Each structure stands twice: as C-alpha cells, then as structure tokens.
Regions:
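Iron-sulfur cluster-binding electron-transfer modules in prokaryotic oxidoreductases
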Residues: 1-257
Length: 257
C-alpha cells in the first residue's frame, strides 16, 4: 500500500521494543525508545499506536537535559531528537482529495472509525477526545464515516491478562455500538485494537450469546482496497471475520454506475 502511494520505507536495521514492556521504569523505557530513534535521521513512521505513544512520550522526556544525558551515556548512537509519525498521518498526507489513484471509491460504505486510547496521547497533535483525522481519511476514500461514541475508548487489550471479563465487556461494547450504528466495517489504527475486535470477535460472540459479524480492517487494508490492491496483497484472508463480502459489495456498487 505504501508503494502504491509513493511512500518510501527504510526499516531500522537493529530496532528493539519501543519501551512499552518497561513503562514501570521511565528511564529504561526512554532508553529503549531513544535507541530506536537514534538510528536514523529520517522521520520514524509506526503503524502501532502503542509504539507511537511510547516513542512520543519518550521524546518528551528526553527534552529534559539530565534524562537525555543519562540515556545517551549508555547508547552507542546518541539521541539528538526525532520526528515520530503514525502511519495514519503519513497516509492522509500522501492521499489527495479526489485522488486519481483511488480506483475503487468506497461509495456508500459505512465505516466506523475506531482510534483506540493511545493515538491521541500524549496530547498535542490530535484532539484527545474528538479527533477527526480518521474520518477525514474515510471521506477521501468516498466512504461514509459512522459516528462512534467509544471511538477513543480503550479496546480492553491492555487489561486482558489480569481482567479478562472486563476486557471482553469493553471490546464487545465497541463492536455492539458499531453494529447498532449501521457500520458495515470497523477500521482500526492499532494492532492490539485489531486483535481485540477482530481475532477475538467470535469468542466474544460465544461468551455474550450474541452475533455481531462485523469485519474489522486495519487502516492500510481499507486504503489498499480503494487503491485497487488485491486481497492477498492486503492480507484480507488473514482476518478472522472475512471482509470479502464488504469488498464484493464495493465492486458491485461501482459496476452499477
């Protein structure tokens, strides 16, 4: 999908965890993030909201001279600053309004935008409670964004291990709201959110005794469909809830025009 939009990617040669697994120790977490950020002068794009939030949080901590000096004392490459961007932001910047590369406009497709709790934190780039960047992207694909009250709520993933029932209740509430709002598909910008809403959806249906059956697409998959990329290229057959009926309806709508 990035290639189709002219986005050139260069993977970090020796990346490590973003620091999320060590958040209880702010200095270690900042050091892990700084080690990643120090490896390149290019903007760093991540498709994971957890990584995005941790890298941005670390960058803010590293503005403190004392913290930066303590971290740099143990790094081979010294951290001097970084430009951290989420894939959603880069995609939107690369996709013009009425973009000619959109060969399959997703007209009439009702899409529920789900941000999750970390894309907008730390604050500064997007409104923490009322972000609209995902709705703007959905609009550029000519689909219809569906209002979702829980769009910035946690998916339940971070508490799944210690509090499975609470996590299940949270995830199911998001799915049920999207279904009730008439959404044909949910689009996510975080792999953990995608796991909770897609991979666990059938398990949640069994536990709650209610069928939802709503496909969940990661944002690159939704954009890729509009760009005319094939199901295999986009990994659509790897989704737990098949999005193929949604894709087929999109083609049928185009054929009728």
């Amino acid at each position: 999908m990035c290639a189709a939009l002219g986005i050139e990617l260069e993977e970090l040669s020796d990346w490590n965890c973003c620091g999320a697994t060590h958040v209880s120790n702010e200095l270690v977490a900042a050091g892990l993030a700084a080690r990643n950020m120090a490896q390149t002068d290019l903007p760093i794009m991540t498709p994971c909201s957890i990584c995005y939030s941790n890298l941005r949080s670390a960058a803010q901590r590293l503005e403190d001279v004392e913290v930066r000096e303590r971290v740099n004392a143990v790094l081979d490459q010294k951290y001097i600053g970084a430009n951290i961007r989420h894939a959603l932001d880069v995609i939107l910047e690369s996709l013009a309004k009425k973009d000619e590369r959109i060969v399959l406009p997703l007209k009439e497709l009702k899409v529920a935008p789900y941000y999750g709790c970390l894309l907008t934190r730390p604050a500064g780039l997007y409104s923490p409670q009322f972000p609209t960047i995902l709705e703007e992207l959905i609009g550029r694909l000519e689909a219809q964004p569906v209002a979702l009250r829980h769009k910035t709520s946690c998916c339940g993933g971070p508490i799944f291990m210690p509090q499975e029932k609470a996590a299940n209740d949270i995830a199911f509430a998001i799915l049920a709201e999207a279904k009730a709002a008439g959404a044909e598909v949910i689009v996510t910008v975080c792999p953990l959110c995608h796991l909770m809403l897609d991979a666990k959806q059938k398990v949640l249906e069994q536990k709650m005794g209610r069928e939802i059956g709503i496909p969940v697409l990661y944002v690159t998959q939704l954009v890729g469909i509009a760009l005319g990329l094939g199901p295999e290229e986009l990994g659509l057959f790897m989704n737990s809830v098949s999005p193929m009926p949604v894709v087929e309806r999109a083609y049928e709508r185009i054929a009728k025009e």
